[in-house]
Amino acid sequence: MWEPKNLLSPCLLLLLGERPDHGYELVRRLRPLGIVDGDTSTVYRTLRSLERHGCLCSDWAPSGTGPARRVYRITAKGRAELLSWLATLEETRRRLDYYMRRLAPLIENRHGA
């Protein structure tokens, strides 16, 4: 079954576009999107990659209950990248809709046979 692992970057940009956050909380916010199953190291690698490419910036912020946490923020370049992803996702949705319209008669014929 297909897993949306290639959607991790745009999902992180989306969440950070909504508000700055630290890694652990981003992992928690990704779960309802079906992006993270158990291996969180991919999330942290992707955050570092997005930061290296200038899509995010980060700094250390004190935590009320423990050590300081790295808080990530989206940059102007990250917002532009997010808009680019929007166009890609809209095109993907258009293609999937076309596929589903063609698939529907095949499924109906199979159940009717």
What are these regions (language model features)?
Residues S58:
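Short beta-strand "wing" residues that participate in macromolecule-binding interfaces
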Residues G54:
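Glycine-centered, phosphate/nucleic-acid-interacting loop/turn motifs that mediate DNA/RNA or nucleotide
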Residues Y44-E51:
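Short, hydrophobic-biased segments on the C-terminal half of alpha helices
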Residues W2-Y44:
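N-terminal helix-turn-helix DNA-binding core of bacterial DNA-binding proteins
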Residues I35, A61-S63:
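Short polar/acidic secondary-structure junctions
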Residues A80-A113:
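Amphipathic alpha-helical dimerization/coiled-coil segments
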Residues G64, A68-L86:
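Basic, amphipathic "hinge/linker" alpha-helix immediately C-terminal to the N-terminal HTH DNA-binding motif
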Residues R48, S63-G64:
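Short secondary-structure boundary/capping segments
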